[in-house]
Amino acid sequence: KVIDIIGQGLDIHKSYSSIEERNEKIYEMLELVGLSREHASRYPHQFSGGQRQRIGIARALIMNPDLIIADEAISALDVSIQAQVVNLMKKIQKETGIAYLFIAHDLSMVKYISDKIGVLHLGHLVETGTTEEIFDNPIHPYTKSLLSAIPHPNPRVEKVRKSFTYDYK
């Protein structure tokens, strides 16, 4: 059940003095991620993809970490659900001060959620900078290639958009 999934970290580290305290912490996490106490008694297959991500976020938050590594955390979700999850992550970050290492291929989402960006190519970090530095003035040819591949929402601009080709050989 969801209560056991979210409470696993508490159980492993014996971070409570009573079952009531354990459950109250779990209920607080559920509410923080936009779910209700009643969801605790349900099974994962009874939830949508977005709700499952919220459960995963609650599970990650239950031990009060300083950093969460989110590896392709939203890639399997519909665009509208992606936005909800990322907005939730930003809200939680503002409330708790938590940091995220957000790993993704969706550059528009990376731009939206990130303060600083690192660009990896073939397992190597090829460029780092603030979001503005990377998007406004990319230095590495691979970064330039990635950014030039982002479609523009304006059809007129998109029609004349030039892509930057990067030959990594």
What do the PLM-derived regions correspond to, one by one?
Residues 20-38, 147-148:
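Conserved ABC ATPase "signature" region
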Residues 43-47, 51:
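Conserved ABC ATPase signature
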Residues 62-66:
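A short, proline-enriched helix->beta-strand linker immediately N-terminal to the Walker B motif
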Residues 110-112:
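A short, surface-exposed alpha-helical micro-motif characterized by mixed small hydrophobic
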Residues 125-129:
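ABC ATPase "signature
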Residues 130-169:
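Short catalytic/signature loops enriched in Gly
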